[in-house]
């Protein structure tokens, strides 16, 4: 027979808001319909003035610590999603947890809830956190993940394309993703634990994005990785720890797609370009391209065909090089441009069929930033 609790009755007092926040963060990794019913559980452990909450789905784990008044230590496993719903609506400042006869009682003000305990002995152990690799401030990391994740593929049959490759080279981290039609690369500086740091990982993009969204942006992000056991990546931030299983596979060789010299350059107000693309693409059929005609310091955006609805808009630009016409998937354009944080976008072009590079630029007459590079393959179009 499985044991429902490791220890005797648990008695805890905890701040309701802190508890609700911790439960919500921890249970976000619990699947709505887990393959193994035990993975629907939230593990709660009380000891030494701390309440530890954890959840796991074999791909990603979450572990959270909050302060609590622990009268009696204990460990329980309860339905995580139900606990999250309950804690969202707790009416009083403090909440009391106690266990008796395989029941967890939650009391807050005049509200009382009881939950059946799940067999804690059946719950899998969380992965062991790898050794510390380095750290970076949270806003920098979050922005880099948001930019790099633009080009992750949704094709589950090619797992490597759903991932973000993270390359750690001394004080520089480079994140790259591609779905074969576009490529996103973000680069940032960080503080490595050791001066001679060299590691490459491939982590599922959607998981990395979910982890990054949960960070406290006032605290640093510690990244954990062990070359001897290169199957797991860990993240620590503000008392919260997440791990993610890595993708087993070889990321495509994409470095050759970036070229040093482009013959055609154009600098455009980023938000004005996004707004114009949204307007012009209203007449475009599904998956139809939007044309970008660069001519005489002007950019003409057009969509539609002669026998269909049409739209056109002209923007003033700063251009250097020969006239050129390229066409793109408007959604891919908007997603790439939206990831740029600078007010101007610098487009670099070679021909109408070769990938176009997009970079952010702080000033219209300044230099482009290489912290984020977005490559987009043009679509073929009819004149």
Q: What label would you give each PLM region?
A:
Residues 1-383:
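Structural preference for solvent-exposed beta-strand-turn elements
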């Amino acid at each position: 027979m499985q044991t429902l609790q490791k220890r005797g009755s648990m008695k805890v007092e905890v701040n309701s808001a802190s508890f609700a926040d911790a439960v919500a963060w921890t249970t976000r990794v619990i699947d709505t319909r887990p393959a193994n019913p035990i993975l629907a559980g939230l593990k709660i452990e009380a000891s030494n003035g701390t309440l530890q909450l954890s959840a796991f789905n074999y791909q990603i784990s979450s572990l959270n610590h909050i302060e609590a008044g622990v009268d009696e230590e204990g460990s329980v496993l309860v339905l995580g999603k139900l606990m999250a719903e309950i804690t969202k609506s707790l009416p009083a400042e403090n909440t009391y947890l106690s266990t008796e006869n395989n029941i967890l009682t939650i009391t807050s003000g005049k509200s009382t809830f009881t939950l059946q305990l799940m067999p804690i002995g059946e719950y899998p152990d969380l992965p062991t956190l790898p050794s510390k690799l380095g750290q970076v401030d949270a806003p920098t990391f979050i922005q880099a993940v948001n930019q790099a994740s633009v080009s992750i593929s949704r094709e589950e049959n090619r797992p490597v394309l759903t991932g973000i490759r993270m390359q750690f080279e001394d004080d520089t981290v480079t994140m790259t993703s591609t779905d074969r039609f576009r490529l996103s690369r973000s680069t940032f500086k960080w503080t490595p634990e050791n001066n001679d740091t060299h590691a490459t990982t491939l982590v599922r993009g959607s998981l990395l994005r979910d982890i990054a969204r949960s960070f406290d942006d006032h605290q640093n992000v510690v990244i954990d990785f062990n070359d001897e056991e290169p199957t797991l990546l860990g993240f620590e931030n503000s008392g919260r720890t997440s791990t993610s299983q890595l993708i087993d596979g070889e990321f495509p060789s994409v470095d050759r797609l970036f070229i040093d010299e482009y013959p055609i350059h154009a600098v455009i107000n980023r938000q004005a370009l996004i707004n114009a693309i949204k307007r012009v693409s209203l007449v475009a059929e599904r998956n139809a391209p939007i044309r970008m005609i660069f001519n005489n310091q002007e950019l003409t955006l057009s969509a539609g065909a002669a026998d269909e609805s049409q739209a056109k808009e002209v923007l003033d630009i700063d251009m250097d090089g020969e006239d050129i016409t390229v066409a793109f998937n408007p959604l891919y354009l908007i997603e790439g441009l939206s990831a740029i944080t600078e007010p101007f976008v610098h487009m670099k072009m070679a021909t109408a069929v070769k990938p176009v590079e997009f970079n952010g630029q702080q000033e219209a007459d300044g230099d482009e930033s290489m912290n984020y590079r977005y490559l987009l393959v043009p679509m073929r179009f009819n004149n």
